[in-house]
C-alpha cells in the first residue's frame, strides 16, 4: 500500500477522533458515517480502523504517555492537537514497524493541515522531546 494511503488514513482518523471527542458518539458509528461521506479509494481503511479503535481503546494509557512531555494539561490542549498527539504516540508506542521519524513528520503534517497557525511547532516540540527521552532516537547495533 502506498504511503500516501496511510497518510490519508491518519487524516481521516484525526477527523473521526476529533468528532468523537466533541460528540461522545460511538467511535465505530462515527467512522462508518464519516467513511460514507468520503471517497475511500485512496485510504488505507485497515490502518484507519486500527488507529481509531486502538486509540480509543487505549486512550488513557496513551494520554499518560504524553503527559510528561506537555507544558500544560491535556484538557488545555485543543481537540485537534490532542488527537494528533494521540495518533503519533499510538504509533510510537504500538507500531514498531513505523520509524519514529515518520510518526513525527506525519504529526507535523497533520498539524499544518488541521491545526492552528503554530500547532505544527507545538507538535514537533512535544514529539521531539518524547522521542529523545523515550530513547526512540537511539540506533540499535546488532553484533
Curated annotation (Swiss-Prot):
Pfam families linked to this entry: NusB (PF01029)
MF GO annotations: RNA binding
Keyword Endoplasmic reticulum attributed: no
Gene3D superfamilies the record matches: NusB-like
Keyword Lipid metabolism: no
Domain of life per record: Bacteria
InterPro entries attached to this UniProt entry: NusB-like_sf (IPR035926), NusB_fam (IPR011605), NusB_RsmB_TIM44 (IPR006027)
GO BP: any one term: transcription antitermination
Cysteines paired by S-S bonds: none
GO annotation, cellular component aspect: cytosol
Family: Belongs to the NusB family.
Annotated function: Involved in transcription antitermination. Required for transcription of ribosomal RNA (rRNA) genes. Binds specifically to the boxA antiterminator sequence of the ribosomal RNA (rrn) operons.
Name under which the protein is recorded: Transcription antitermination protein NusB
Organism: Buchnera aphidicola subsp. Acyrthosiphon pisum (strain Tuc7)
Amino acid at each position: 500500500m502506498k504511503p500516501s494511503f496511510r497518510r490519508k488514513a491518519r487524516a481521516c482518523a484525526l477527523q473521526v477522533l476529533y468528532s468523537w471527542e466533541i460528540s461522545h458518539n460511538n467511535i465505530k458509528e462515527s467512522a462508518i458515517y464519516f467513511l460514507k461521506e468520503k471517497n475511500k479509494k485512496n485510504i488505507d481503511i485497515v490502518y484507519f480502523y486500527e488507529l481509531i479503535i486502538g486509540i480509543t481503546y487505549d486512550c488513557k494509557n496513551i494520554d499518560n504517555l504524553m503527559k510528561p512531555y506537555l507544558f500544560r494539561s491535556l484538557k488545555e490542549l485543543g481537540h485537534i492537537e490532542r488527537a494528533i498527539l494521540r495518533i503519533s504516540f499510538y504509533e510510537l508506542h504500538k507500531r514498531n514497524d513505523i520509524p519514529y521519524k515518520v510518526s513525527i513528520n506525519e504529526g507535523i503534517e497533520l498539524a499544518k493541515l488541521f491545526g492552528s497557525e503554530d500547532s505544527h511547532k507545538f507538535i514537533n516540540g512535544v514529539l521531539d522531546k518524547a522521542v529523545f527521552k523515550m530513547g526512540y532516537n537511539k540506533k540499535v547495533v546488532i553484533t
